[in-house]
């Protein structure tokens, strides 16, 4: 994986664009035209639409918005503009075939590389104040997000796992937990316990000197955080299973009012991809295969309501996003009674993610044990705060003080108020996208994404 370049290098950006597109194409290479339409579901897109939308977005922002070129496809906006096309109508569109979609995808990338490749980036800025590199990065990161969406769509639709070239070398310090290699004891290994965070005044958000930030991260602002204790690891399957076995899904006293309404409507009695086997053993569906539940893997595909209900049962709580970012980014003073002014870009420091620090980029083709990868610990000893599994926080997704939408106005503002913030990335997240201050957000009922959580003491 090519990290997001630190400088506005045409060659580096061109290489990142090509690598990102190659990954997108790998994710759908084995799928038929019919599989790339799939059933009409509220939580996924037809993949022929999704892949075409990725190319349309790149064309719109780089070629049309910045360069003021004419559309390649006259009907492109009516097919692929997510702001104009209601989600449930995307299956009814006259979508091109897979082959035609791939030809469009390649044509747009070729045009971008031809115009913005080795001969240099356009240094001038448009009326909105953003230069060409900004829009190339925007399109690239957008493609990274959709590559993750394509992967969880394959999980949702019971497709086989994608065949990813980078996954062929599975060393690099990672020790993947093979699907189905369960914790034979049936008991959790000793927990790493809680990290003590002294609290204090902390800068939440991103600073203007970063190469690229999304509008919802702007800008870093001082927040006061009280001392707290946070789990050093994400919650494991072994820790979540007793909540299920104790009837946690059948006790309305453990659920927020809207959470209980969701549980009754969904008929949820356990995580969405769990299934009870004869003899009381749990199985988990990993893409198209049912495997014995792996005790030390993080609990996956649980929504915010499920995480909140577990916390009530366990006498714990979810961290706020400020607490989460402090635990990931801050450094303790020598006496551990306060934090220093330093703020890390990643839990381990400012160096780009490596395979011995974070499970990202499909490298393990799944999650690893929650106590793996100690080289990626934060200054407070919190593990895997980047990669492996997205982590729900207690915080509603909303603007930071002084928020101003970026050119892509539909990215953040329409979702303020009814989504929850997740942090940290998961095993399919690209290394060029994720860092401590990146904010993801989903509606609290979403169980299809690779979402889990860690807890805080009350």
PLM region spans:
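Short, helix-capping/interhelical loops that line the mouth of catalytic, cofactor-
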Residues: 1-12, 61-111, 160-169, 285-286
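N-terminal regions that are enriched for targeting/export leaders
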Residues: 2-33
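Short glycine/proline-rich turn/loop motifs
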Residues: 4-5, 87-95, 118, 127-129, ...
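Short, contiguous alpha-helical
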Residues: 14, 34-85, 118, 125, ...
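Intrinsic, low-complexity polybasic segments
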Residues: 118-123, 167-182, 186-187
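Functional-site microenvironments in short loops/helix caps that host divalent-cation chemistry
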Residues: 139, 143-145, 149, 155-169, ...
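Short proline/glycine-enriched turn/loop segments at secondary-structure junctions
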Residues: 410-414, 440-447
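Short, structured beta-strand segments at or near domain termini in extracellular proteins/domains
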Residues: 449-458
